[in-house]
């Protein structure tokens, strides 16, 4: 193994990533920094990982045929694409027995 520039990666390359390393290309790790989860997300063999993810424990080996997109094709922010498609609900109701009374109190407090 030797260190190389991420820019020379092509689909199908084998990459070894150790504790604290940044994933240099989309591949099949911990992506909590990209997705916003408060705890690291455990990845298992065959799971997808994204460029910018960080290896938190153990080691990760991207096997031959696993590196996906590189360069301009890398999906830098999968969470952003997901969020752009979401809309906040008009209102949220917990369907509590006193929901109507709580709504009236909230309206009066405005």
Curated annotation (Swiss-Prot):
Keywords: ATP-binding, Cell membrane, Hydrogen ion transport, Ion transport, Magnesium, Membrane, Metal-binding, Nucleotide-binding, Translocase, Transmembrane, Transport. One of its GO terms (molecular function) is P-type proton-exporting transporter activity. Residues 98-110 have a biased composition (Basic and acidic residues). Its EC number is 7.1.2.1. It catalyses: ATP + H2O + H(+)(in) = ADP + phosphate + 2 H(+)(out). It comes from the Eukaryota. GO terms for biological process: proton transmembrane transport. Residues 88-110 are annotated as: Disordered. It is found in: Cell membrane. Coiled coil: none annotated. The keyword Membrane applies. GO terms for cellular component: plasma membrane. It is a multi-pass membrane protein. The N-terminus is blocked. Its main location: membrane. InterPro entries: ATPase_P-typ_transduc_dom_A_sf, HAD_sf. Mg(2+) binds at residues 72, 76. The plasma membrane ATPase of plants and fungi is a hydrogen ion pump. The proton gradient it generates drives the active transport of nutrients by H(+)-symport. The resulting external acidification and/or internal alkinization may mediate growth responses. Belongs to the cation transport ATPase (P-type) (TC 3.A.3) family. Type IIIA subfamily. This is Plasma membrane ATPase. The lineage of its organism: Eukaryota, Viridiplantae, Streptophyta, Embryophyta, Tracheophyta.
């Amino acid at each position: 193994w030797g260190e190389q520039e991420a820019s020379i990666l092509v689909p199908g390359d084998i990459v070894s990533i150790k504790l604290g390393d940044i994933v240099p290309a989309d591949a099949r790790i911990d992506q909590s920094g990209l997705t916003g989860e408060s705890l690291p997300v455990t990845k298992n063999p065959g799971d997808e990982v994204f460029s910018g993810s960080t290896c938190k424990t153990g080691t990760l080996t991207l096997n031959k045929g696993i590196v996906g997109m590189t360069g301009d094709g890398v999906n830098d922010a999968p969470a952003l694409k997901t969020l752009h498609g979401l809309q906040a609900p008009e209102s949220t109701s917990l369907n509590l027995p006193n929901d109507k009374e709580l709504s009236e109190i909230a309206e009066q407090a405005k």
